[in-house]
C-alpha cells in the first residue's frame, strides 16, 4: 500500500504552517498579508528574491538525515539548536507546502529581526 501524499493533508499543513506563510504559499502577495516581518534575523529583507526567512520546530534532535530532507525541499539552514529541534533558514515561497508535508516538521513561522 502506498503512503498517502502528505501534500494532500490540508489539515496537517494548516497546523504546521503559520497562517501568514500559508497565505503566501497560496499566492497572496506579501504586502497584502498583515503581520509579516520587514527584516529577517539575518539582517536581509524578510521577503527577498522569492524567499522568506522562517523559524522551524522539528523533531529533535536535528540529525544529518533531517537536515538533508529539509534542504531537499529548498530550505537553506542559517542556524539551529539541534538538541531542541529549532532551525532558522530561508526557503522559496513556492516550496512552503513541500516543507509542511515533511513528517518531521512540527511548526513553521516567520522569523523576525525587526
Where are these regions (language model features)?
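Autoinhibitory N-terminal propeptides
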Residues: 1-114
Amino acid at each position: 500500500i502506498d503512503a498517502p501524499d502528505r501534500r494532500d493533508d490540508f489539515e496537517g499543513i494548516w497546523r504546521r504552517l503559520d497562517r501568514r506563510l500559508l497565505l503566501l504559499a497560496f499566492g497572496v502577495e506579501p504586502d497584502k498579508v498583515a503581520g509579516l516581518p520587514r527584516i529577517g534575523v539575518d539582517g536581509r529583507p524578510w521577503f527577498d528574491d522569492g524567499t522568506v526567512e522562517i523559524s522551524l520546530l522539528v523533531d529533535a534532535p536535528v540529525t544529518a538525515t533531517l537536515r538533508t530532507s529539509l534542504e531537499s525541499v529548498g530550505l537553506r539552514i542559517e542556524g539551529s539548536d539541534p538538541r531542541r529541534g529549532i532551525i532558522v533558514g530561508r526557503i522559496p515561497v513556492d516550496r512552503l507546502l513541500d516543507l509542511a508535508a515533511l513528517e518531521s516538521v512540527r511548526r513553521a513561522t516567520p522569523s523576525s529581526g525587526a
